[in-house]
Amino acid sequence: ASFEPSIDYVITKIPRFAFEKFPGSEPILTTQMKSVGEAMAVGRTWQESFNKALRSLETGLNGWGLNPKDGEMLADPEALKKALTVPNPARVVAIHEAFMSGMTAEDIRKLTDFDPWYLRQMEDLFQTENWLKGLSGVSDLDKQDWLEVKRRGFCDIQIARALKITEGEVRKARIGQDVRASLKRVDT
């Protein structure tokens, strides 16, 4: 039987840099190949695949935002500005820190020269993170909210950090709303 494939997924690949393995090397990205591998993730949206890919890098990130080290760059605005202007492995984390500091997507674009589409996607993730932080508890999330948060790629640990509860409590509430992980087949 013939059928037309549907392209209803996004693939995001993110290189993995390990400058700690190369003492004396500058953690600045240039035209020279410096990655030691990459992570690839598939999702229904760019935000979902982006969050999944960041988790897959094995660098301690739970995704984009709601990580244990969030806010570390805020103490030194000049270091944050340098992390945004100079291509480096932590640049994507620096963009999150820039949003935390109150910068707009346009401010960040001027410093990074990132495409505005990606910055709008990241800004939406940041706004969703702040919305989650503003909730009084996991009971504030109805099934539609859960589906939207998951569509953006937020994992249970990120939601738990936002709500200041355990990952187990998040999982129990999510399953209580009948929102479960699922696998999809890629048709091409």
Task: Give the residues covered by each predicted segment.
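ATP-dependent carboxylate/acyl-activation modules
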Residues: 1-188
